[in-house]
Amino acid sequence: MCIRDRVAGAIQENFPKEVEAATSYCVWMSAPLYYGSVRFEANKVTADSLFFQTMGIDVLSGVPEKELMQKDVVFLSDRLARKMFDQENPIGKVISYNKEIELTVKGTYADIPENATVRPDAVISLPTVWSRGWGNYSWRGGDSWIAFIRFRPGADKSVVNARLNDLIKKYRPAEDQKVVGYTAFVKPIRDVYREEPDVKRMRNIMSILGIIILFIATLNYVLISISSLSYRAKAIGVHKCSGAGSGKILGMFLLETAIIILFALLLMGLILLNFRDFIEDTTAVELGALFSLDRLWVPLLTVAILFLIGGALPGRIFARIPVSQVFRRYTEGKKGWKRPLLFVQFAGVAFICGLMYVVMLQYYYVLNKDLGYNPKRVVVANTDFGNKENQDYALTFFRGLPYVESVSSADSHPVYSYSGTMIQDESGQSLFSSRFCEMMEDYPKMMGMVMKEGRMPRNENEVAINETYGEWMHWGTELLNRTVYNSGYVCKVVGVIKDFRIGNFTNPQAPFILMSTKNFGNCVHVRLKEPFAENLQKLNKVSADAFPDKTVDFRSMEQMIKESYNSIRVFSNATILAAVTMFFVMMMGLIGYTTDEVRHRSKEIAIRKVNGAEASGILEMLVKDVLYVAVAAVVIGVAASWYVNDMWMDMFAEHVPVSWAAYVLIAIVNLLVIVACVLWKSWRIANENPVNSLKSE
């Protein structure tokens, strides 16, 4: 079960019959670990002593219930311990967190599988942060803490949910309900991830894509098989005349399908090995985990279904045809099977093309849309320089570098959003949560932010707000000299900053409070001169030399923005891959259909030409035959893509404008490709001497 806030311990204490264990953890300590001078990047959590018991993680060495009650203690995953110490015993080894805190390794635990949402390689004891006064682990705060509880087998979870709000009232002051409000409940850990709106949305869309690709590919194979009946009918007839029964004929087709699928699987294996990085990036999981034994039934079941549909359907059609009709009935074009299959292919390709167009358009839209600040050539690094003297030295050092254009700092940066604070009215009633950040006076100018009116705050009693804050407060156009009640602080509005993007464009525009600081550090921002990449390397090297006792890693802000849309990029790549795949699948099916139609109707076409029909008329007849199927299919496919695009775009606060004309153009392009393919395959027979066709008859 997963819950938020500091309630885990209280639940365990008050529900001993239902709850077996409970734990709280946070992910603040995200800086690197060091063993000597060697740096290690690893996922870390700061947790209490019942973390392993609650989460059901196997402890390989050490006693976490005892050791994690001490400060400056760490437990390492078996993977990280081997990476750090090779075959040496890790117990008792001392490592460093961010070159600031020495941590003693007191135990190891089993590696956590990739499919876990909580997958730390290091668990640091909770007293490590308590002893330094970091965070707010109290009943009046601490919303950055995540808590889990483990129920006893057979426990009634509804008992806990029914009494949970009353339990919280015992610990939280009564005025908190009025000021900030709260709701407490327990929820299965599996549902926490699966029921996130973005996860559900992407799961539905990717499921639709996968089903469409598999379904159309299978139907395409069936279509090609059925299209081949005319020239394979004699062979089947010979087999039947030689005594082969329906089962034998069906078995022949199943064997043929099995051989084709086997070669397809071998080709797939080669593709997986040669494009491993791309595939793992797209699926966000290693191939070993994707095809692990406990999940292997999924691809095996998929292959089995494809085998049954692709082999059994055309096989049964042949097997059930009487010998007396084999040579006669299938010398004519039989479209009853082929047209519906072709319809599905056309609709599927139109759907994926419409989806691909909007996904790519939205991805490049959010990457290039004005953010309200200028991230070009800006790099950021999180570090604390300590006292004022060291801060001044660091500021002077960075400003003195010849390849640095400007320098400033703030508590954080806008790419990953800011911390929040509750805003109240004069009576203390909670209104909403606002983002806030302390910035040096020159920071907005350095970042290209626009101060619409007023000035920067100069002391702790002054703030600047953004436009959205004024809108949420319903203050109209008169924003200066207003009073802000901010979690117990009363401040005067002295400036209004133009809205800028906080987080990425999947987040709605949030209200924002800007406060002043004269301290240099926390999140250092540097705008470099060109050449950017070369100067970034220089900056990181000289920073490491100038501050050897600190971790000073500058990262490109533009790259961070791109990474914040990584899931969108992956989805865009997936839709492109799906569209290209389905385009070629459709082309194979259409070519097979057209070739078969031309073969069947060669005598008809020859007679029409003998009677005076022009080549253009023949081509028009064949094109119309396909368009009867294609037009309706493409319209349905494009309409379906519009619906799914609308569902996908709900995850963004800002949408790229897409008019109906774009969907019409997508439909027209699809139809033009279909017509071009038909003309290409029909051109020879339409311009051929009709005598040749009549001779062959």
What residue ranges belong to the model's regions?
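Membrane-proximal juxtamembrane linkers immediately C-terminal to transmembrane helices
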Residues: F15-V19, D58, V118, L290, ...
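Mid-to-C-terminal secondary-structure elements
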Residues: D48-L60, V74-D198, T396, G400-E563
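Small-residue-rich transmembrane alpha-helices
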Residues: K169-K170, T257-R320, F351, L361, ...
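Hydrophobic alpha-helical transmembrane segments of multi-pass inner-membrane transport and secretion
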Residues: V199-K234, I261-L262, L266, W337-Q362, ...
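Intracellular coupling helices
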Residues: L219-I260, R320-T331, M588-L627, N687-S696
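N-terminal Sec/SRP start-transfer signal
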Residues: R316-A347
